[in-house]
Amino acid sequence: LWVLGEDPPENPTLRGSKVQLVPGKREYRPTDTAGILVVAPFAPAEGLLTVRRDGLVKIERVRLERRSSTIKLPLSDRWLPNVTVELDIVGAVARDNERGEPDLSLPKRPAFASGAATLKIPPKDRSLSVRITPEKKELSPGGKTRVALQVSDSSAHPVSGASLAMVAVDESVLALAGYDLPDPLEVFYPTRGAGVRDYETRLNVALMRPDTARH
């Protein structure tokens, strides 16, 4: 049996939307509780909040009653110097009609959305300050002097038993060599990636055509 005519329209596939996550601060301390503003494309919605730092470190289920809400997340000193927070939500929205416009007379279609943000937690509490006070401000070639060294923690409290290495170098030699003293905290606390790869099977969901959904 052969039938002539146009090809039937394909069923549209499900497409994800974007969730906007806005951290309340540019930087946090390890003892803070981060407030994250969530701007969702639909509500109500069920969601899964994941904290990522070289893998999953925390998973929490959330429910959004409104499109705009705030999620509280207690931080940890194990998350230095940063973590990635991702929110994946699912729900239902109005189905489009044949003209591509939302039609409330049709059954709702499934919907999903996701978004991520980075929370910076610099290791400031683990940094030390060294104050150098020379006995003499100027010296002649071959002269000698004494130098007082004071080590303080991030709260400006003196640190006892600290080990120091002091080097006296001609500043002009360093300038010619282009030497720049590196920050040791950046060496020991480099920026961490999420370390997680997501696969979304909902992208394979085929939606009913509007003419089919009416029956």
Protein language model features and the residues they cover:
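C-terminal segments of large proteins
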Residues: 1-215
